[in-house]
Amino acid sequence: MAVEPPLPHLVLPVRAATPSGELVRLRRLVDGEPRPDSSSEYDDWGVFDIHFEEDWHDRAMVEVSPAAGGPWVPVGDMSWHSELHGPNLGSRAISIGVSLRADARGRGIGTVAQSLLACALHRGGVHRVQASTDVANVAEQRSLERAGFVREGVARAAQVRADGRHDLVLYSCLPGEPVFVAQ
């Protein structure tokens, strides 16, 4: 049974700039469109049911362009999915994640992309936007904090990868909280 992705009519913001002036934009992935290779040490999922992956979330391409203008270059992608924290839609949160090519990391692109998506989700009526990352992924923790997310704590043994269970650091962003890019 196919499940409709969360917020299928979400309007993604046009673009925003990194501190170095690179422009970042998000655009929805087209069905079957290849994604950039953005694998990292945190992506070894082991046995994975691809049908589950395709049915439970939505995706956007992360693209960059030089500050002076030029072509948009895909450097990664983002995903988001619904999570319920209670029995009603008011208890729904949207969890987001970003994955960037190795050469795009450390440039502020992930910070801007996560902030853009959080702003779009808030404008689309989502109250709680959340993210999580491995406790060892300090770079992503800093990126989320720069994007305006608030660290909430650690979810112990919350994620399973090929080498076993991993603790995750949880973050959230609520409407009205400061974010990296203007709303």
What function would you assign to each model-found segment?
Residues G106-A120, V138-R146:
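Conserved acetyl-CoA-binding loop-helix of GNAT-fold acetyltransferases
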Residues I109, S132-T133:
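Residues that cap or flank secondary-structure elements
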Residues G97, A104-T111, G153:
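Alpha-helical hinge/cap motifs
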Residues M1-A104, A120-V129, A136, A158, ...:
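GNAT-family acyltransferases
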Residues E145-A155:
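Conserved acetyl-CoA-binding loop of GNAT-fold acetyltransferases
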